[in-house]
Curated annotation (Swiss-Prot):
Name under which the protein is recorded: UPF0291 protein BPUM_1689
InterPro entries, alphabetized: DUF896
Region (Disordered): 1-31, 56-76
PANTHER family, per the entry: UPF0291 PROTEIN CBO2609/CLC_2481, UPF0291 PROTEIN YNZC
Pfam families per UniProt: DUF896 (PF05979)
Alphabetical list of SUPFAM superfamilies matching this protein: YnzC-like (SSF158221)
Amino acid sequence: MISKNQLARINELSKKSKETGLSDAEKTEQKQLREEYLKAFRSSMKNTLKTVKIVDPEGNDVTPEKLKRERDQNLH
C-alpha cells in the first residue's frame, strides 16, 4: 500500500512538473513513486476482482473458470 505522504509527493511533483519543470533527480523520484503506486493499485484491483461473482439475468453464475480457480486457490 502506498502511504499518504508518497501520494502527496506524487501530486506535488506532478504540479511542479506542469508549472516549472522537474530536475533529473525529481524526474527519477517521480517515476519510482508512480511505479510503486501502479504496483499497489494493480495488486488491489486483482484482489478485488478475485472476490467478484458474475451472474447473468437468469441468476446463473457465469464467472469465468480462470477467476473461479484463482479464488479457490486463495481459499486453500
